[in-house]
Amino acid sequence: LVGSEMCIRDRYISGEISRQTRGAIDAFRAMGKQCKDVSGGLPTFISPWIDGKKAVQASSGRLTKAESISVETHEREWNEIFDGIHDVVDACAFQDGHIDYDELDAFFSVNKKLADKYGMQCWTNAESFDRDMPIKFFPIKFDKLRLKLEAAKRAGYDKAITFEFSHFMSPQSAYLQAGHLYDRYREYFEIK
């Protein structure tokens, strides 16, 4: 509670998946149902990643991988996943950092189309750190964050969340660049 107001309005199912992994649909369905049962039916959301070319282990020295998911395969697999979970998961905020900037529109459009098909909300999870640098990870340049947010808007998304504000965008972060990223964000959206 904050004062007399409930501050939790939904439940986040924190398990992360990207593709149709064996048992994923059943696991997310069970977790979504449990969240709904214990919360009295509050909305639930997930934030999966897209198995794009930037989906490499943070501990590796690589920035990209040779094999990545096509838009068509992503659509087919997530159609099956959404079909199995849409009655217990209300929203999906795909992480945007594993695909390249020239792929944002294609993947975002597919995500929105599938979410609409299954009556789910589609948000973006705009990563506020940069996967394009050999040192992992620094706060992202605002121009790159803006590109991702604008692609989400073009696809019809009406909500955005970010990972990871406290490290990569907060004025209180140990990274000096994080405070500057926050300032650019506020300027762009005319937030006083």
What is each residue range found by the language model?
Residues L1-I8:
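Short, small-residue-biased leader/transition segments that mark boundaries at the very start
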Residues K33-C35, E80-D87, N111-G119, E150-G156:
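Acidic (Asp/Glu)-rich catalytic clusters
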Residues R11-R22, A93-V110:
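Substrate-binding surface in catalytic domains of secreted glycosidases
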Residues R19-G23, A55-R76, M133-F142, Q172-L176:
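Short, flexible/disordered intra-domain loops and linkers
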Residues F28-E75, A91-G97, Y118-R131, T162-F165:
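Aromatic-lined carbohydrate-recognition surfaces of secreted/lumenal glycan-active proteins
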Residues D96-D100, Q121-K192:
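Substrate-binding cleft of secreted/luminal carbohydrate-active enzymes
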Residues R29, T64-D83, E103-L114, K144-K148:
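Alpha-helical scaffolding within the catalytic cores
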